[in-house]
């Protein structure tokens, strides 16, 4: 499952709940900056922050939280619940 959202200027962001694969798009004129590890740290005015494991933990004002298994459990105000097999069984709320 992929969770997608966009900021007020039209930049799109997404994260896959199990693999934690993070994707983004920029708009014309955006400068892309990278951290020492080579990860994107800024897309225009949007800052990207990572946890110690290298997983995205914040995109602008949207926080991303993980469960013990390392699966995404929250993206902003969107909550994700899994069954014992690791499949998404329920989502509630919205990202923003």
Functional labels for PLM-detected ranges:
Residues 1-96:
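Repetitive, compositionally biased segments used for assembly/scaffolding
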């Amino acid at each position: 499952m992929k969770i997608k959202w966009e900021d007020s200027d039209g930049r799109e962001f997404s994260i896959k709940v199990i693999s934690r694969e993070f994707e983004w798009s920029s708009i014309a004129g955006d400068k892309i900056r990278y951290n020492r590890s080579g990860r994107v740290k800024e897309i225009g005015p949007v800052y990207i922050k990572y946890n110690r494991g290298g997983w995205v933990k914040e995109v602008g004002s949207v926080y991303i939280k993980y469960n013990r298994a390392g699966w995404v459990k929250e993206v902003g105000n969107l909550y994700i619940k899994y069954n014992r097999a690791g499949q998404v069984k329920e989502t509630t709320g919205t990202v923003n």
